[in-house]
């Protein structure tokens, strides 16, 4: 029979893998933009990354709510901010605003790396203590 500790450990490992996938997808998107790949390829990568983030954020926020994580609102606000950045990237791509596009992709990458190393780490530590 599984325990809450087993669930927490599995949830934390799953979330960590999802963070690795998120970073990989975003780096691939940034590279495609830098290399000025086709509109359809960039649109597909952006859509895939956006969809992945939405699914990840829903699952992560559900676990936070289940555990009454005290930093939930600030953490969820970060998720909203990243989704806003993705909309900016999409607009910059569609309007061919290359200087703004470079700035927005750089900002998104720096933001998610910082988010994972700070907020997500605190959440992982919280889950670990909850075991």
What residue ranges belong to the model's regions?
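Small-residue-biased structural context
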Residues: 1-131
């Amino acid at each position: 029979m599984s325990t809450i500790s087993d669930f927490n450990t599995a949830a934390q490992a799953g979330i960590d893998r999802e963070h690795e996938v998120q970073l990989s997808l975003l780096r691939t998107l940034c590279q495609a933009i830098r290399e000025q790949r086709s509109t359809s390829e960039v649109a597909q990568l952006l859509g895939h990354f956006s969809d992945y983030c939405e699914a990840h954020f829903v699952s992560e926020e559900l676990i936070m709510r289940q555990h009454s994580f005290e930093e939930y609102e600030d953490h969820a606000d970060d998720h909203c901010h990243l989704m806003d950045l993705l909309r900016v990237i999409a607009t910059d791509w569609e309007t061919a605003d290359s200087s703004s596009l470079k700035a927005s992709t750089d900002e998104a990458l720096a933001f998610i790396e910082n988010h994972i190393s700070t907020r997500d780490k605190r959440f992982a530590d919280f889950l670990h203590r909850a075991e």
